[in-house]
Amino acid sequence: MTQRKDAPLVALIAGEASGDILGAGLMQALENRYPGARFIGVGGEEMAQAGLTSLFPMEKLSVMGITEVLSHLPELLRLRKSLVRFLLEQRPDVVVGIDSPDFTLPIARRLHDRGLKTVHYVSPSVWAWRQGRIKGIKKSIDLMLTLLPFEARFYEEHDVPVAFVGHPLADRIPLETDVAGARKALALDRDARILAVLPGSRGGEVGQLMPAFLDAMVALNHQDPTLQYVIPAANAARREQIQTLLNTQPNLPVSLIDGQSRTVMAAADVVLMASGTATLEGLLLNKPMVVGYRVGAVTYAIVSRLIKSEFFSLPNLLCRQEMVPELLQSQLTTEAIVAAVRRWFDQPEQAQALKIQFQSVHQQLRGGASEKAAAAVARLLEA
């Protein structure tokens, strides 16, 4: 299907909520450049509102961990096959896979082999583990768009076309956090000491982390009954899952809130959270945090042998040093969580030093990420 240069057909594939946000920003920036552009592929509500015609619901791609992926593998393979067939029929001017690399990069390889221009937006953690993937990536895409500067350096070293675009969240989130405004918006006590607890957005993630987080909350409550807890539930299913666990501790002073995770973090003094994109939001909000990561035993046995990076949380990777405690797998004990959380509450001077470092990183990541990504895609379209 041949398109006019000023009205390209752009395919985008997102598999998670964070990718949906990035995709919507890219679509809006591309539409500013090409008012007649059309968008097809797979996305969520944000991308739909930006004008995407989605082949199937993005939620079908949201699975976690190796064993979890295996249980969904037949359906994922079927979806991938139908998506490849659809895109080969449509022949878009460019195909942009957004994150979810185990799903999107094999699609890019097939489409690239058939002459379509392909872009991957959000680098997989190839610099941290399974570095051999770089060879396959190089054969699958015309361009990598990275959110973080150290990722771009890695691709340059391996002769993969790359553009560092920064992170859209760094543009959206102010350098100074309005704690009082966030607390007012959530009807929280202005003077309370608040711990935000973010156990993740996926069922498997919450199932792995929330019991450990809850045990720590109970222990903290015994030590300091004045401490308050706020948990944002990513969706109705996560709310029900979390509420079931909270029902076992009816006397805990906890507020369970629908969504608004960024506002919840902004309102908090300290954040206890799952590893992932939300840790970057925590950094941009200047929040002291404790980061937990736990997956199934089989997944961890495989992953632990392949990890090359010293850190797994984005704040530590971006700062190139251990700024926040990371509790991995068996390290995620009640005692360790309590000690790490208490350290932030008891040592405000360390929290202030953290804020200075985080604001420096925030500045590096600012500067119109969606527009930079659109400019890089436009250069490829017009090449």
Curated annotation (Swiss-Prot):
Q: Any idea which GO molecular function terms this record carries?
A: lipid-A-disaccharide synthase activity; phospholipid binding
Keyword Transmembrane belongs to the record: no
Name used for this protein in its record: Lipid-A-disaccharide synthase
Q: Which residues form the signal peptide?
A: none
User: Which InterPro entries would you find in this protein's record?
Assistant: Glyco_trans_19
* Tagged with keyword Endoplasmic reticulum: no
Pathway listed: Bacterial outer membrane biogenesis; LPS lipid A biosynthesis
- UniProt organism field: Alcanivorax borkumensis (strain ATCC 700651 / DSM 11573 / NCIMB 13689 / SK2)
Q: Which PANTHER family is this protein grouped with?
A: LIPID-A-DISACCHARIDE SYNTHASE, LIPID-A-DISACCHARIDE SYNTHASE, MITOCHONDRIAL-RELATED
Provide a GO CC annotation, any one.
Answer: membrane
The record ties this protein, via NCBIfam families, to:
lpxB
Gene that codes for this? lpxB
Sequence similarity: Belongs to the LpxB family.
- One Pfam family name is LpxB
Catalysed transformations (reactions): a lipid X + a UDP-2-N,3-O-bis[(3R)-3-hydroxyacyl]-alpha-D-glucosamine = a lipid A disaccharide + UDP + H(+)
Alphabetized UniProt keyword annotations: Glycosyltransferase, Lipid A biosynthesis, Lipid biosynthesis, Lipid metabolism, Transferase
Q: What is the annotated role of this protein in its UniProt record?
A: Condensation of UDP-2,3-diacylglucosamine and 2,3-diacylglucosamine-1-phosphate to form lipid A disaccharide, a precursor of lipid A, a phosphorylated glycolipid that anchors the lipopolysaccharide to the outer membrane of the cell.
Could you say which EC number(s) this protein's record lists?
A: 2.4.1.182
GO-annotated biological processes = lipid A biosynthetic process
